[in-house]
């Protein structure tokens, strides 16, 4: 009791102290070209400085500075570094304010090169074609730049050497964990990197909208709205192997003497565990390292939508509004900091619907004031006057979920260890057609299977091909206003959310084909809730 096989401790508990400067300016003007045509235009200037750590502890992995001749040798199938054979800082660059022996000083002074100046033009036009004030046509275009958060830089500070190292003592005991001689782990180390030629992400927005007023109380509009994202951020794992590469390479197949050699991957072999894939550490692009999480501004997106709105006003404050959107949002980046393509050598193969894409969104909201005893005179007037019913009814289709598989790497990518990349299965049929839509099986789970042995490729199922459950919701409020004086009133409110207590399913227990809960629903949105409120209006 109290004996440990291994005790591990990080050398430092580092807290990032990051800084960055930014300069922004904006100019806008409006030109009435004709009495019924107005043009507005502007320009926004943005310059975002390189983030840096005040203490100079920000290092970055730059593939251009990796020297294979300085890389660690790997101990055969054990997949560990051989002590004394390589430069532990190979490929790493460090801030010029805090140089470290054996490391390359950043040619940029900081972790990345200075980002360029950004100019974002905007232009819009409003046209009243009939000069009656009842019809308008609007169009617009603009470019909008985005300043990336500090999150990836904080990961670098807390992960990359030389300012973070790990001591391992093994074996040891609970009452004396530091007994013995600590050694630096020889396991390959994961790294974080940021593209040194970092480009500022930007989005182009454009729109064309037609609006018409029918009479004095009805307004209808319909328009096309689109956008395109460029240089969007996303993670890659630079140390994954190309599919089939391991088949053509020779590896040391043991870690003892005498050494034996053979193919790194045999014909028809499917890697099913991280232990089996340790042999691939000998042929990784950046030998001596594990996963290399690399933030690149190489991803794109596009969005197209039809948006329709209608409003009808009635007497007093009564009105009803309807809004409908049909849209399509596509991208090759799932999540800028968390997910990685299953094959970083072909991240364009990730192009699919965005994780937050909803094809149909319908919303109806209304307010109805009972037209009785508005002046609230007398006992009957105070009782029957001042009542109002309002509510929101909404419906939207589900978001997409990605199928997954585990312990399966027929392509020999080397993603079963510490790599953040996840594998997907093969696509056999559309899982949403004739889907059972049961809690125990929402979609057709037979539509996915592991790639067959010997194909030496990743699964061909796309991201977010499983359509999640839709949402239908009815919310309403019954309010009673009691006039206290000419300028004061008391409002009593009874608010009900999800009036019909309709069950709206949300997420799956698992979309991994190897899971025992594959395809099952495990969560719902809020049930019916009510609340009472009162407020004084003055």
List each language-model region with its residue ranges:
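Signature of Gram-negative outer-membrane beta-barrel scaffolds
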Residues: 1-130, 337-341
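Short, solvent-exposed micro-motifs at the edges of structured domains
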Residues: 19, 36-37, 48-50, 171-177, ...
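Short, well-ordered loop/turn and helix-capping segments at boundaries between secondary-structure elements
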Residues: 125-129, 146, 150, 368-373
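Charge-dense, low-complexity polyampholytic segments
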Residues: 6, 61, 155-161, 534
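Surface-exposed extracellular loop regions of Gram-negative outer-membrane beta-barrel proteins
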Residues: 134-171, 230-236, 390-397
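Short, solvent-exposed turn/loop segments enriched in Gly/Ser/Thr/Pro and often Arg
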Residues: 43-51, 55-56, 140-148, 225-228, ...
């Amino acid at each position: 009791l109290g004996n440990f096989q291994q005790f591990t401790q990080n050398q430092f508990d580092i807290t990032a102290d990051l800084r960055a400067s930014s300069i922004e300016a904006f100019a806008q003007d409006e030109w009435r070209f004709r009495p019924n045509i107005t043009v507005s235009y502007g320009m926004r200037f943005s310059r975002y400085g390189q983030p840096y750590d005040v203490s100079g502890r920000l290092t970055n992995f730059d593939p251009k500075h990796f020297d294979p001749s300085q890389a660690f040798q790997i101990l055969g199938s054990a997949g560990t570094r051989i002590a004394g054979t390589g430069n532990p800082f190979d490929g790493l660059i460090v801030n010029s304010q805090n140089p470290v022996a054996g490391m390359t000083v950043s040619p940029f002074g900081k972790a990345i090169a200075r980002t360029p100046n950004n100019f974002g033009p905007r232009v819009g036009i409003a046209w009243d074609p009939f000069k009656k004030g009842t019809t308008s046509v609007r169009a617009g275009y603009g470019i909008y730049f985005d300043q990336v958060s500090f999150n990836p830089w904080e990961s670098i500070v807390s992960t990359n050497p030389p300012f973070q190292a790990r001591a391992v003592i093994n074996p040891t005991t609970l009452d004396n964990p530091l007994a013995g001689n600590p050694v630096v782990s020889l396991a390959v180390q994961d790294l974080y990197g940021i593209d040194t030629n970092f480009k500022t992400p930007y989005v182009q927005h454009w729109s064309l909208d037609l609006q018409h007023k029918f009479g004095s109380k009805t307004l209808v509009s319909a328009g096309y709205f689109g956008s395109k994202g460029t240089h969007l951020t996303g993670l890659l794992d630079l140390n994954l192997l190309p599919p089939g590469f391991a088949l053509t390479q020779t590896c040391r197949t043991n870690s003892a003497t005498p050494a034996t050699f053979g193919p790194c991957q045999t014909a028809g072999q499917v890697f099913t565990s991280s232990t089996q894939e340790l042999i691939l550490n000998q042929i990784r692009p950046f030998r001596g390292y594990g996963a290399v999480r690399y933030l690149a501004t190489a991803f794109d997106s596009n969005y197209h939508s039809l948006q329709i709105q209608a409003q009808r006003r009635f007497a007093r404050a009564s009105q009803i509004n309807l809004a409908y959107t049909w849209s399509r949002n596509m991208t090759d980046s799932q999540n800028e900091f968390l997910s990685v393509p299953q094959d970083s050598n072909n991240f364009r193969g990730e192009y699919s619907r965005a994780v937050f894409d909803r094809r149909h969104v319908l919303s109806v909201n209304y307010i109805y004031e009972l037209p009785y005893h508005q002046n609230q005179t007398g006992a009957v007037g105070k009782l029957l006057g001042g009542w109002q019913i309002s509510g929101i009814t909404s419906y939207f289709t589900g978001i997409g979920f990605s199928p997954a598989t585990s312990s399966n790497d027929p392509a020999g990518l080397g993603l079963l260890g510490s790599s953040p990349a996840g594998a997907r299965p093969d696509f056999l049929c559309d899982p949403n057609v004739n889907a059972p839509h049961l809690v125990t099986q929402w979609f057709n789970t037979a539509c996915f299977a592991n790639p067959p042995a010997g194909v030496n490729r990743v699964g061909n199922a796309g991201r977010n091909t499983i359509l999640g459950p839709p949402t239908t919701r009815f919310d309403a409020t019954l309010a009673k206003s009691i006039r206290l004086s000419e300028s004061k009133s008391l409002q009593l409110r009874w608010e009900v959310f999800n009036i019909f207590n309709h069950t709206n399913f949300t997420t799956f227990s698992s979309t991994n084909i190897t899971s025992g809960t594959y395809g099952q629903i495990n969560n719902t949105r809020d049930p019916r809730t009510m609340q009472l409120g009162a407020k004084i209006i003055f």
